[in-house]
Amino acid sequence: CPAAQEENCMDIVPYLKLMVQKNGSDLFFSTGAPPNLKAEGETRPVGTAPLQSGQVRKLAYGIMSDDQIKEFEATYECNLAISVNALGRFRVNVYRQRGDAAMVIRYIKGVIPPVEKLNLPIILKDLIMEPRGLILVVGATGSGKSTTLAAMIEHRNQNRTGHILTIEDPIEYLYTHKKSVVDQREVGLDTLSYENALKNAMREAPDVIQIGEIREMFTMQHAIAYAETGHLCLSTLHANNANQALDRIINFFPDSAHQQLYMDLSLNLRAVVSQRLVKGKNGQRLPAVEILLLTTYISELIQKGDIHTIKEVMEQGNERGMQTFDQSLYKLYQEGKITLEEALAHADSRNNLSLKIRLSDTDGVAAPGGLGVAEDQF
């Protein structure tokens, strides 16, 4: 918390402690409802007393700097990150709803877990060691994209020399210099805007560039340019799968630019890693991961703009670790990590996955695991 607000920060610390104790991911503060904590994908109230008008604003202002308060009062939005001694780092979004302040706080784990501990495909360790190209990690909000990206970057940090540059809004995981030098630039703190940071990134001589998120054409153009000029560029994108990610990228650009874009992607895209979190039998969440790799055939399809054939090609074979969501879910089910109901609930093709499971030699299915906390209250 900012030094000037340390006393006010005490108001919110008990909630942050609870989130850490319960391994929660998000805290929600909204007038008229009690604070709510999300843990292992389930959201439950903390206590029963609803927050009164002005309370959320007071909590929020207690962790914001004067400049952040001015930004919020001018734009009704503010993103920030805070660090609390003995607890860790938290990402905060403050916004207005129905004329009053509301706030969401996300817990950013202090230790970056390795790829294996996150139950992610080992091929991600190979991808992050690529010398150049574009790697996208896509998924819905809260699907673990940032954590996956951090695990990949930390693997490179531990195993290869070089310069890793991240441009984030805000910084989510803190890296320490290991084999690589890792420079982290936070928008609003270390640079005035994404645009300024992206324009100057090349002058900072990076080997790897991480862009926090691609939301529009300008950022996508820079990501492709970095890959074209011999850098490894990584970023996240909001999309449900590889096909949707490619469609979204194409829709960033006018029709007149599509042919060149297809060519650029066919030459520079290395992988699209799509992720969903599913509930394991033990109540903890596991990643189901779709991986699109730029094989020769996939490159040809992208160059022709034949995006919707890609899914069929992925289903026909898992070359070098390429896999669909349904193949990932099938594997998790076969390993006894998730129930049949959970696998089918997240399948792209429920009927196809159900048939594949029925034809397998799998035994009975256990009931889904619980949240691991009291059912009524935290």
Regions found by a protein language model. Name each.
Residues 5-378:
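Short, flexible helix-loop junctions that flank or precede catalytic/ligand sites
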Residues 1-2:
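Short, low-complexity, intrinsically disordered N-terminal modules
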